[in-house]
Amino acid sequence: MNISRFILVRHGETAGNKDGLFYGSTDLPLTEHGHRQAACVAAYLQDIQIDTILISELQRTRQTAEYIRAPETHHYHCDPRLNEMHFGEWEMQHYSEIAARYPADWETWMNDWLHAAPTGGEPFPQFAARVQAVADELCGEASETPATRLIVAHKGVLGLIITRWFGLPAEAMWQFPCEQDSYSVAECRDGFMTLAVFNGRSCFTPVV
């Protein structure tokens, strides 16, 4: 049986997470707590062979990946399609500030976020399409070449990848909230995908 594994890791905490702000494309570093979270995930995955590492362009994913496997020993494949959604003029603002400054756009977003865009930001359909394209490519690679691939990305991105792999609509992404300081594992066995671990917080032992 051919088995491919995807280890999905959300980056550690940033100041934007800590302060409850809308942000995606803003390139924030990890907080001290975020560094500790990344170290915890690295410990959970220390005994797993990892063949390929994929990250976004944003430093918080690279900083997290560096705890899991050092760049001196593993090449990082940086894919801009794995970047978090760009929230335009809403970046680094609290929802209460956004509602006050952009009331019409905020109301549109709240009523139909699946088809709307933040002020000056990325429309959700465009965001979903680029992430789903990566998910499709990875699924095809998994069927052809068995390997263990680590993906360090963002909450929205990882949720969309999971829903794509399991044939769910994009809005189901919120049913798979990948948490910081944890990891998830999707396995492709002879072309059939399963979710083996979700938000795991203990050492991972693969089942052959």
Regions found by a protein language model. Give the residues of each.
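Acidic, low-complexity terminal tails and accessory targeting/binding regions
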Residues: 1-4, 77, 88-97, 144-147, ...
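Short, hydrophobic/glycine-enriched beta-strand segments
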Residues: 5-11, 151
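Loop-to-helix element that buttresses phosphate recognition and phosphoryl-transfer chemistry
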Residues: 13-68, 118-132
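Short active-site segment of divalent metal-dependent hydrolases/proteases
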Residues: 14, 157-158
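Phosphate-coordination/substrate-recognition cap region in phosphate-metabolizing enzymes
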Residues: 39-106
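Active-site catalytic microenvironments for nucleophilic, acid-base chemistry
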Residues: 44, 67-71, 137, 141, ...
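Glycine-rich phosphate-binding loop signature in dinucleotide/nucleotide-binding domains
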Residues: 47-49, 138-147
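Short basic (Lys/Arg) and small-residue
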Residues: 154
